[in-house]
């Protein structure tokens, strides 16, 4: 970060309340986008002379997710997989993370946009697992959850149809594996960050749709979701 703050122009963004003809609903206007820009600037200013911490990167992603809204409908889902040793992420949703009662301030509400899980790369010892489980129970939010990369690799190799030599992650609900970077024989990533689509797909219902139209849309959405997930 060089200390330079770019300027932005949101004059061409649809005004708040403008009707969305294709999707339906109303536009959110430029204010959420401006709020994101200001939030990002403050995060970078607070990290002058150092790298962003894991929780700062997490918060930036959550804030982006918060403003991804179309027609008043949330259009984002997130998951953060963190190291066992990352205490910041362990407590990202612990206690009264969502507000500050004495000041009536909504502090970290954007963190509700993401599910958080620890990513085990090997079987933990009993005490480490117990500490993590205790933290989950005491958080009041049921997080961080637990994701096991070893188990994910075994699951990917199970039917023999997929190359298991990747660093596996999952979609935000953790019901499907998503491929990350390819790894070498020493377990080190040898490609970029990887990336794969989630299996979730959505059907938009229009006032003019018939039953036949809806059945066709559901069929196509099912096919698309299957392709995305494989």
Question: Where do the protein language model's features map onto the residues?
Answer:
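Function-dense linear segments that define catalytic or interfacial modules
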Residues: 1-29, 33, 137-230
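Glycine-rich and small/hydrophobic secondary-structure elements
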Residues: 25-47
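Conserved, charged catalytic cores of large soluble enzymes
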Residues: 31, 42-43, 63-166
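Flexible, glycine/charged-enriched surface loops at secondary-structure junctions
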Residues: 4-7, 47-59, 71-81, 229-230
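General structural feature for long, well-ordered alpha-helical segments within catalytic domains
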Residues: 32-40, 56-64, 129-132, 196, ...
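Contiguous, well-ordered alpha-helical segments that form the cores/surfaces of helical PPI scaffolds
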Residues: 18, 42, 62-66, 199-202
């Amino acid at each position: 970060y060089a200390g330079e703050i770019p300027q932005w122009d949101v004059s061409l963004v649809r005004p708040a309340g403008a009707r969305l003809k294709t999707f339906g609903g109303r536009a959110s206007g430029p204010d959420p986008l401006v709020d994101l820009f200001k939030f990002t600037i403050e995060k970078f200013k607070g990290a002058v002379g150092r790298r962003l911490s894991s929780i700062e990167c997490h918060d930036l992603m959550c804030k982006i997710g918060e403003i991804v809204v179309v027609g008043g409908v949330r259009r984002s889902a997130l998951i953060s997989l963190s190291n066992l040793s990352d205490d910041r992420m362990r407590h990202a949703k612990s206690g009264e993370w969502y507000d500050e009662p004495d000041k009536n301030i909504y502090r970290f509400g954007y963190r509700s946009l993401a599910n958080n899980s620890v990513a085990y790369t090997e079987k933990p010892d009993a005490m480490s697992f117990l500490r993590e489980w205790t933290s989950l129970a005491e958080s009041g939010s049921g997080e961080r959850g637990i994701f096991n990369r070893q188990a994910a690799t075994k699951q990917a190799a199970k039917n023999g149809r997929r190359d298991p030599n990747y660093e596996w992650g999952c979609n935000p609900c953790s019901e499907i594996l998503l491929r990350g970077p390819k790894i070498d024989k020493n377990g080190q990533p040898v490609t970029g960050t990887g990336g794969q689509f989630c299996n979730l797909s959505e059907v938009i219902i229009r006032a003019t749709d018939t039953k036949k139209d809806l059945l066709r849309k559901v069929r196509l959405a099912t096919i698309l979701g299957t392709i995305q997930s494989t």
